[in-house]
């Protein structure tokens, strides 16, 4: 024994080597722990330095503002009356005198110009007065006031002769028919006066027969017309109203619509004859009827310039007359209604039938009419009937282009035949109009479908500034209104409801977390501490926090786009590879910010990625309940619900680090590109086995047509060895996530992943329901308490 001790004085025998190795391991472990503590101290020191630098920056800002204020006050002091010497002030007096003289000269020049302008205005006023007094009693004024089209072919003296012939043929008129000249003159004057008060006259005078409500008696209308005529005659010739916008456009329209006005005059005469024959036949065959107006009096009754059955509204004693007219060809096509009751024959209107009425109060409105574009000037006129129809805004005189409406057709038809054509081939513009419009819409929709605009801008920041939130013990109801019935989401923690801040009305989200023990409370506090350090547009922001006996409530930023996979599985959403690039890039930017602050998310999955809007490509990462600060050699057991997004080191309970999150990013990217889960098996055990062995491949059908850059991106993330995976910084520099403009110019590939994603989500929902049913069946087997 002594010999052995002499040869081996240090005691390094076969049994001494393990002891020495154990001591070395203990020493290395102690050094690593010391190193970890130093790293933590450095991190805390870095945070303190950052806070102090922010305070210094704020102090510098305040100092700069104070310096600016001081300079401004000094400048004001130097500019004061006592700042300059008397000698300098005396030297500046001549300049001031020169400036005053120049101002006086300019004032005199402006006065002379104003005087000349005043003289010009007086001369123009006199000229207008002369023109008004000249035209006041002319035939042009009579035609304008009587509502007759002044630019029709023929002599201007034809109008009064036609009126005389109509008056001779009129015979016995009903009580409600008024004198043409007085009522129409008063109506035109009333319409002009209303147009001066407001720009929205109810009626439009189109040079067509006026339609007046039968509920008003003839004596009342005659009295109103007489009062209006007295008001018009009382006007001074110098106060003659200027011509309206439509009247000023009459000469221009006269040269364009000469052909159409001939058709209009023929249609008016034809309508007069039709009404005369119809009323004579009604009075001879049917006699008087209680359900019809009094039209059984003997004698022919032409249409005349005035017909009834329209609404007259009074505004400050001035009647408003709404004018409407439709063309008709034969007596069989006439269908006149009053308050919803037919006059004459009660046949249902068909193609070519005309409804000539103005819907009174309480009557059933007609469907809105299609827009018709006028050829003169490109203006468009839209007619609508019913209580909800708005009055036509514009001048009191509106001309209508009758070339767009063929004879025998009308817009107010029930049961209109879409295949009906105009009897005259030269006037089928209205029949071709809808077809052209539909063709134009198809072309525009095809052009819009060919041009797809993708929004690659950054996600919008939170509607509030980043803040360090401290937990409050007060009731949440004192500051926020939580909508318990409006659930935004849920999970292992609890539910997320929509809420509103009482003081500002800001829309927020309230995450209610149930806690049962001290460990749960510590986890929630850890989540709050981590979110206090996050300030990035792709990460959800914390606004407030409340603690109660059995729960925590985190008030966070609200986004209404829904989960990422809920949106891309929508049938109306078409996913392309460029869309996946935009989504993946923003996910990598958020993860890169987390890793820069030594934070691991450890629960990246599609359910924890929200879209900011329903149409854009902006996303935000949520749920930091499992997030941890990075510490070397830490074993972390994750309580997860869906295993196919976990990294092999998490399944094996090994050390986790930054590449753990990048594995989840690779799985999410694979699913976005293909619609398949790379490791999903029939059971959870099979799924974990695939993850541990890293057994996956690119499906030949789903990845057909995708770029090699996309496959390379996924291949460099789904690697079993942690050190071989790309980091978030390397992902952002990858070729696939860059050069978006070039990719957008040549991106015409549409993915087939949408249907596969729908099938995948349906399968997951089915599995969840199956587990719920299984759990319920197991609970039923437990014996019940007596």
UniProtKB/Swiss-Prot annotation:
Biased composition (Polar residues): 279-293
Signal peptide boundaries: none
A Pfam family that the UniProt record links to this protein: Pkinase
Tissue specificity: Expressed in cardiomyocytes (at protein level). Up-regulated in heart after experimental myocardial infarction at the mRNA level.
Record flagged with keyword Transferase: yes
GO biological process: cardiac myofibril assembly; cellular response to interleukin-1; positive regulation of membrane permeability; positive regulation of sarcomere organization; positive regulation of tight junction disassembly; sarcomere organization; sarcomerogenesis; signal transduction
Active site: 603
EC number(s) per entry: 2.7.11.18
Inducing or repressing factors: by NRG1 (at protein level).
Function field: Calmodulin-dependent kinase that phosphorylates MYL2 in vitro. Promotes sarcomere formation in cardiomyocytes. Increases cardiomyocyte contractility.
Protein known as: Myosin light chain kinase 3
Organism expressing this protein natively: Rattus norvegicus
